Amino acid sequence: SAYYDYSQTPQNINKTLKFSQEYLEELERRSGISGLPEVEIGPNGDYVYYGNTDWYKELYKKSTFATDHNISVSGSSGKTSFYVTGRYYGQDGLFRYNTDDYKLFNMRAKGAVQVFDWLKVEDNLEYSSMTYHNPLNVGEGGGIWRNIADEGHILAPMFNPDGTLTHSAAYTVGDFWYGKNGIDTEQRILKNTVSTTASFLKDKLRIKGDFTFQNNDNDQTQIRVPVPFSRRPGVIEYVGSSKNDIQNTNKTTSYLASNIYGEYEDTFKEVHYFKAMVGYNYEESRMKNVKVLRNGLIFDDAEDLNMALGQTINTEGGYSKWRISGGFFRLNYVFNDRYLLEVNGRLDGSSKFPSDSQYAFFPSVSAGWR
């Protein structure tokens, strides 16, 4: 071993495979002989492996499948119109076991109604739902590829003769085969915008407004349980014995936005053009996050926090809120299509600044001639 300046023969290949000079000599002897068993029992009663396992072949499927479906319907009459569309996208995971499936559903519905000659109302509704499963390794706590690099020894097979996982498998692909460890994520987004447009005085006075709300819900469940394996017949051990817990995370975000403005324009005596606009906007967002972890799952297939009875309980919360609002105006005057005067002003407020610095006024004046 280079670690010991080549003065000693290593006794292990990382954590999961025993090594000795006799083992190396036996491997050399077997290299020219076919038909020998991949697994034997050594003098000490432990399994001894002579396999040729391609762990990446065990990890990945030969092929995967994805579906994408779209549908849309639209129509209109004299004073109404609508448009509805939907999409489903599903992608089967790449992994052979405990695979990383992904599903996405989107829907949008839009409609407009000309209530009166001077009033139009529109609505735009959007909904999205996503689910994703991310398998986990509990052995080293890292990604599957790192664990294969460390413990995916080609000599060790996936299973022992009695059907139990080998030590190398339990650290790598065998954890996926066991199928208990992973993170399930669900995300739902609902958004709706209602808008109105009104016009008066032969379209000289126009008022527009809209109101939007959006809710984002993110749920995540993480489950970690030990993975059983055998180093000798009839004896079960576990990888990740310190990890036996469930963690629920919920994050919700609520968003509101409102805008309204009106504008008036007219020309007097053919040379005096006047336009005025005034409006207001408001936005608000609230985020709340709750995370709870508890150990001591009473059985491996538990999927609810009530099925954990351990003494280790970790909780974590989070909350944020902000608001912004603003009022604005603009005045335009044009004389004889040659002289221009424009006055603008905004009063903006934001809760993201200290209480004595949350509001500010921003005026501007411009003039032109051609």
Language-model features: where?
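Short Gly/Pro-enriched turn/cap motifs at secondary-structure boundaries
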Residues: 60-64, 319-320
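Residues on the lipid-exposed face of transmembrane beta-strands in outer-membrane beta-barrel proteins
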Residues: 71-75, 109-113, 192-198, 260-264, ...
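Short glycine/threonine-rich loop-to-helix capping motif typified by GTGT followed
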Residues: 355-360
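Extended, hydrophobic alpha-helical segments in both membrane/secreted and soluble proteins
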Residues: 107-109, 209, 258, 325-331, ...
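Outer-membrane beta-barrel channels and translocator barrels
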Residues: 66, 77-78, 114-118, 201-203, ...
